[in-house]
Amino acid sequence: MSAEGAGPVPSDHADRIRWNAKWAAGSAPSFTPHLLAVRALALDLPDGPVADLACGPSGSVLLAAAQGRRVTAVDVSEVALGLLGEEARRRGLVRQVTMVHADLAAWSPEPGSYALVLCIGFWDAGVFAAAAAAVADGGLLAWEALTAEARRAHPDLPSAWCLAPGEPASLLPPGFGVLDQSEVPGRNRRRLLARRASSIQ
């Protein structure tokens, strides 16, 4: 596993400990691609790799790799990345996938380097800004995260982990067009699909 643009994750990192425990104790992952990833990968995309942030054992990574894309899979849990790597190897896709064990807050992707940046179930405004900057001309940014409504059911959930009204579309930098932003019915989540304009006219 590499640490592209990031330092090592400390052994006492709270999220690392929590997610390692979850994936170590849980049942085998289904590796079903997320619907937002399926939709994004079916659209017109420029050449180039895909990044899946806070990926877990992601079927979306495997789908992109099976379509011939090189994929960067970033997660704070090496247990999750290990499960994903085993499945990629089983499917003959391991050479397509780069595992990055990193805290996303410390991960610094190269600007304009990805045809698609995907993130499901995680929110941090700073990470969102870095992810948007990493999208290539003509590429897509696909994001799904909890909304503030989730705090009604889970009052201890930090507000910084939840989307405010209008987000994340309202935080897109200039040059992006929103293809869709919508609520996920019954999930207290919101999805965004946005495209960076191409510089080629």
Task: Kindly give the residue locations of the regions a language model identified.
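Conserved class I S-adenosyl-L-methionine
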Residues: 1-45
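Conserved SAM-binding loop of SAM-dependent methyltransferases across substrates and taxa
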Residues: 57-67
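Conserved SAM-binding motif I beta-strand of class I
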Residues: 70-75
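Conserved SAM/SAH-binding beta-strand->alpha-helix loop
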Residues: 77-79
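Conserved SAM-binding strand-loop segment of SAM-dependent methyltransferases
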Residues: 92-104
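A short acidic, Gly/Pro-enriched loop at the edge of an enzyme's catalytic core
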Residues: 109-116
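A short, conserved alpha-helix within the catalytic core of class I
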Residues: 123-134
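Conserved beta-strand signature within the Rossmann-like core of class I S-adenosyl-L-methionine
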Residues: 139-146
